[in-house]
Amino acid sequence: MSFRMNRYALRGAFSGIVAFLAVVAFAQPPAGYYNSAEGLSGQPLRIALHNIIDGHTSITYAQLWSAFQSTDAKPGNKVWDMYSDIPSGTPPYVYTFGTDQCGGYNSEGDCYNREHSFPQSWFNGDSPMYTDLFHLYPTDGFVNNKRDNFPYGNVGSADWTSQNGSKLGLCLDPGYNGTVFEPIDAYKGDFARSYFYMMTRYYGEMSGWPAPVVQNGDLIPWEMAVMVQWNDLDPVSPKESARNNAVYAIQHNRNPYIDRPEWVHAIWGAILGVPENAGPEMSLQSNASGLHVERGTAAAGTLFVYDMAGRTLLTSPISSGRSYIAFSAPDGIYLAEVISPDGRSVQRFVW
């Protein structure tokens, strides 16, 4: 890495994420679809969105196979499997609709099945959640089985890694130390917005669900923080927007967080008690080999460093006070985020 005289940190509020990782809304909801939600925030917004998307048209479990052909299709009648796809490269295997549908499987690449990203055991397998396409995806059967009913989260040291880089292992996120499943960075936002859809479509119905990540009708704090982070760092893609439109054609409702991803913060920023521009004071400086992070008396947490595409480049535990973290990257602008029990702090920096 060449020496540069003007390496410096750019202090910024959390609201800068929106501009820094700008989300372009490709999906086009019908005119007036969200009129009753405009101008609201917090729980009133969530309730208004619930009333808009409630009562969707349900399909049968068997009909999911054909539905996937319009919601999750690549060119050539191929399955868009987020547990095996590699957007920036060549996937290890690609399934054909119908031909490669599970049956049985013994390893990755055998067949695809129906993945409840929000596991069915978490809502007792009840309808209409059981066939709600906004959280159901076609995925490799073997990887689906490995994921099992584990929550989504950020993995520290992986116990198992799929061929596209999805991981299973102990959770790195503050507040939980069990096993989690981590999809690749390119699809984290897709799954996060699926979860926020579930928290909105089934608002008022979740209090009796045995979901380990749901408490008092909402995501528990550690999982909520992960989902908010993933929503921010993997912006809505044309693929996700096209899927929103395809599901709308079948179910006659939409995922509002694909159409308007900023509504995640408008609702759950307040629930988390973390306004967009708040968090423990953080000062970050870089040198030739790493990052010096000063956080005063803030609690220990986890440092994440992202590039402008939202890819995670570094995940590291961080202590209170002053920490030094080894880091190296090409010249450019990066985003540092610290999540701790105190909240989250975000700062852009030039490397």
Residue ranges and their predicted role:
Residues 1-31:
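Bacterial Sec-dependent N-terminal signal peptides
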Residues 27-89:
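N-terminal module-boundary/linker segments of secreted carbohydrate-active enzymes
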Residues 86-111:
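Short, His- and charge-rich active-site/binding loops that engage polyanionic ligands
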Residues 102-113, 117-270:
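Domain-level detector of nuclease and nuclease-like folds
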